[in-house]
């Protein structure tokens, strides 16, 4: 789970103000933070299949949001993937 301080930091960076939590870029950044944390968890706990299901759901949700952002605002999409370093 992401700490409140880290979550607020991400919201300010990608949402431009503290109340803008529904912004697609903010949602993608928060999901990316969760995904990175879960990757480390799976290195230690290879047989944790229950958490793997949630991990896959988060990856798919991020993928859908990235596709939405790419279609509706390509410039924001490019900025987001460069800032998060998730695609080449």
From Swiss-Prot:
Superkingdom is Bacteria
**What's one Pfam family the UniProt record gives for this protein?**
Ribosomal_S15
InterPro entries cross-referenced by the UniProt entry: Ribosomal_uS15, Ribosomal_uS15_bac-type, uS15_NS1_RNA-bd_sf
Q: Name one GO biological process term.
A: translation
Q: Does rRNA-binding show up as a keyword for this record?
A: yes
The job of this chain, per UniProt, is described as: One of the primary rRNA binding proteins, it binds directly to 16S rRNA where it helps nucleate assembly of the platform of the 30S subunit by binding and bridging several RNA helices of the 16S rRNA. Forms an intersubunit bridge (bridge B4) with the 23S rRNA of the 50S subunit in the ribosome.
Looking at the UniProt entry, the stretches that span the membrane are none
Species of origin reads: Mesomycoplasma hyopneumoniae (strain J / ATCC 25934 / NCTC 10110) (Mycoplasma hyopneumoniae)
**Record bears the keyword Ribosomal protein:** yes
Give the protein's recorded name. Small ribosomal subunit protein uS15
For molecular function, the Gene Ontology terms on record are: rRNA binding; structural constituent of ribosome
User: What are the leading ranks of the lineage?
Assistant: Bacteria, Bacillati, Mycoplasmatota, Mycoplasmoidales, Metamycoplasmataceae
């Amino acid at each position: 789970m992401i700490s409140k301080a880290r979550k607020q930091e991400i919201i300010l960076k990608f949402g431009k103000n503290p109340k803008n939590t529904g912004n697609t870029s903010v949602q993608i950044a928060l999901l990316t933070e969760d995904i990175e944390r879960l990757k480390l968890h799976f290195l230690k706990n290879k047989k944790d299949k229950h958490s793997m299901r949630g991990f896959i759901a988060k990856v798919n949700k991020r993928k859908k949001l990235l596709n939405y952002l790419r279609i509706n605002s390509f410039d924001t999409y490019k900025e987001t993937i460069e800032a998060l370093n998730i695609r080449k």
